Amino acid sequence: MKKGNFMFKVLLMLIAGIFLSIDAFAQQITVKGIVKDTTGEPVIGANVVVKGTTTGTITDFDGNFQLSAKQGDIIVVSFIGYQPQELPVAAQMNVILKDDTEILDEVVVIGYGQVKKNDMTGSVMAIKPDELSKGITTNAQDMLSGKIAGVSVISNDGTPGGGAQIRIRGGSSLNASNDPLIVIDGLAIDNEGIKGMANGLSMVNPADIETLTVLKDASATAIYGSRASNGVIIITTKKGKNGQAPSVSYNGSVSFSKTQKRYDVLSGDEYRAYANQLWGDKLPADLGTANTDWQDQIFRTAVSTDHHVSINGGFKNLPYRVSLGYTDDNGIVKTSNFRRFTASVNLAPSFFEDHLKFNINAKFMNGKNRYADTGAAIGGALAIDPTRPVYSNEDPYQFTGGYWQNINSTTGFSNPDWKYTSNPNSPQNPLAALELKNDKANSNDFVGNVDVDYKFHFLPDLRLHASIGGEYAEGTQTTIVSPYSFGNNYYGWNGDVTQYKYNLSYNIYVQYIKSLGANDFDIMVGGEEQHFHRNGFEEGQGWDSYTQEPHDAKLREQTAYATRNTLVSYFGRLNYSLLNRYLFTFTMRWDGSSRFSKDNRWGTFPSLALGWKIKEENFLKDVNVLSDLKLRLGWGITGQQNIGDDFAYLPLYVVNNEYAQYPFGDTYYSTSRPKAFNENLKWEKTTTWNAGLDFGFLNGRITGGIDGYFRKTDDLLNSVKIPVGTNFNAQMTQNIGSLENYGMEFSINAKPIVTKDFTWDLSYNITWNHNEITKLTGGDDSDYYVEAGDKISRGNNTKVQAHKVGYAANSFYVYQQVYDENGKPIENMFVDRNGNGTIDSGDKYIYKKPAGDVLMGLTSKMQYKNFDFSFSLRASLNNYVYYDFLSNKANVSTSGLFSNNAYSNTSAEAVALGLSGQGDYMSDYFIHNASFLRCDNITLGYSFQNLWKTQTYKGVGGRVYATVQNPFIISKYKGLDPEVKSGIDANPYPRAMTFLLGLSLQF
């Protein structure tokens, strides 16, 4: 009986299984269909997915697709540039995709307003930081590096929290600022840093940035007038949304940094061998027995962290966003560190059915720097005797803190027991240079602004916009140097440098937007006033602990300063569109600057731009493969008044230094001296012509643009030498000449692969720029030049760069080296270029320049399901560098390795060169081609969503990722790093290679 029951149950189960299978089979159907756009053209490569599953396919070249689905399923069809469609499943489906108007109407922020991307007439590029880039940048400038044609970003060096040199289409000036104007949420920022803060971009945490817009040509920048000759970078930060439930985001990372490359100097064993080769058994002084790698003593593997938390949300009419950030960035040079705390608040309330809108922004940053004495540390590590130990407990070294140093006996101090001191003319212990100097800076910066926008009830086309904003920043750098130190032995040093700045800005403008049939008008007029104030002082002293008296005191009253300048402006803009095809933009701005005398105070800066949407013409409207084609033409004039001195046109007296005092009895009083002035100073003016073509194919799957430009700057401002006795100084700021930049830019963005599971985004840009000085006021003398650039290590304050007519700014100005038949330089033998029978300064010539002729950038991002992989590359061609390291070591004779009773190290490269230091440092031999290909970063990530999801909780989404920054450089340049902003490669703080692990979460 039991057996019968069992068989009966098995039979029932089999029958049930058969019916279930039949039912399931009945639900499964084959879906066939075609996807077209609104013009009836097939959409190739559209994604067709069963909603809520991984089942899907893509359309073929005719727009057809086929897949299996169940009755009741929803089919989701999507493609780039179209609105996604969700449709119930059917055996035969005809899907029509409509253009995504949000993409077509994408708005780009420009000066004092915004415009549809499709209606822009100037050379403007906007980028939105990718969600997949979160956490891999600690500075806003990193987001621009290699991403935009015509924009060069070179970090100053590897210093934690260090700034960067940003150039848009080369420099437009010689001595005035070449930095672009930075505008953050509508407020133009003073780009001059203070102690502890590199520049205005340090103010913004990269995680808070929504978009970066770069205005490149004068037709786009002229609305900013005299502050826009070098382009404009507009940063818009993230904001909340109306009615949005609160959401919390977190981004965090930990990173490990190390040196990518080190200088190749002789080891202790190699140095002893070479010394024996030079002197034999007649060494001028004993060598040590150690084998110290001094670079190991100053470099380290550094661990850094970064955290950022934000809360977004919005009540009915009050969107809000609050964010906090903390960065702890340890440098690869021991003791160096940068800590940054940022906070930002945005409120955007609206009233009267959105007729009255407010936008309130407040940002705060506190930065704490611990600076390493990089010059002393790296210079010492490359020069000090490698046969000596780091520390010594011998008696003389108690006066150097137990660190081994080259020392001399002394009786020059008041304490008779202090019998030894450091030899000031010898290389110093690099670790002591770091550990015996505590150099810290603390800075606070607050930026806030309130925008009010009112759309008139009786005339909704008319808007009134008013804004008031300001910045307050303070920074103090405190330097404490031990009395056991190399440079301040016995006395030490304790001093402060304090700086303050506060700026105020307010503007008001009215805007009228009206459409009349085929005519669209956008008219704006307004005014603005900006005030900039700076003040500060220095104070400090050494201390004689034996006599209890100060030494070499620097007094606040001798160093205190205060300065200010004001800019008053009036501006207007007209945008006109006919038939949504023909575009016209005209702007005008008048600036009055307090930096010039009343006769030269005002500058006029107009611009004009034309645009033609060729794609909208009837002869191209039906060419579906072409999604965009627009021609742009622009002309404009911008100005420059950022000359560093607010009162260069006024006769002023300034306080002398402490060495120029006058005695009255037993008291010494500070004196004042007249300062050079030039009441004829006037504006630099830069005129720019631009022609561009924007294109798009396959409904935006391929987009790009090409631009050609010509820019000429007249009345260049520069500090030049003047005849003795003609003014109160040997140098004075003057308008000295003209400078030209012209070039081409090309950029392209593509999605080569778009499938259900895999997408590939690729961006490439290339820039060619030519820079040339066309006029200097030195007359017609072909040999006239203006000395420029940084000093090199050898010589007496020697510079090897110059401004000269017919050549690029900051070109190298050197002697032409003579070589033997083997290609080796013949020491102290140069070409007599002027043919006068002797080698003199007239034989120097212009040879190469630091700025590259061609810049390129490539970014690749791939996504496969939840995984992503990306990398960024940058290249520079024909940028040249003065190889200061080799030049400084290029004396491997006995006098080069031993002088002032101390040994100095050298390199194998210098030994092979075999020079003996007879003045070759101004030779073109040391100007090296530093073209390079650099990989900025490589990232692998994994995204997840709906983690811990419940019926009442949406779950947690996020991403984990691993990044390596600066993994490799390909270059023939033998120095530490081919990317040198000044062109003089003189022991900079090395750029690190960094390994980073990060986590992003959305709650």
From Swiss-Prot:
Record carries keyword Membrane: yes
Disrupted gene: phenotype observed: Abolished ability to grow on starch.
Biological function: Mediates transport of starch oligosaccharides from the surface of the outer membrane to the periplasm for subsequent degradation.
Localization per record: Cell outer membrane
Top-level taxon of the source organism: Bacteria
Signal peptide (residue range): 1-26
MF term (GO), any: starch binding
Membrane topology: Multi-pass membrane protein
Protein induction: By maltose.
Protein name: TonB-dependent receptor SusC
Positions of the TBDR plug domain: 116-238
Pathway(s) annotated for this protein in UniProt: Glycan degradation; starch degradation
A biological process from GO: starch catabolic process
Source organism phylogeny: Bacteria, Pseudomonadati, Bacteroidota, Bacteroidia, Bacteroidales
Gene source species: Bacteroides thetaiotaomicron (strain ATCC 29148 / DSM 2079 / JCM 5827 / CCUG 10774 / NCTC 10582 / VPI-5482 / E50)
One Pfam family hit: TonB_dep_Rec_b-barrel
GO cellular component: cell outer membrane; outer membrane
Xref: InterPro entries: CarboxyPept-like_regulatory, Plug_dom, Plug_dom_sf, TonB-dep_OMP_SusC/RagA, TonB-dep_OMP_SusC/RagA_CS, TonB-dep_rcpt-like, TonB-dep_rcpt_b-brl, TonB_rcpt_b-brl_sf
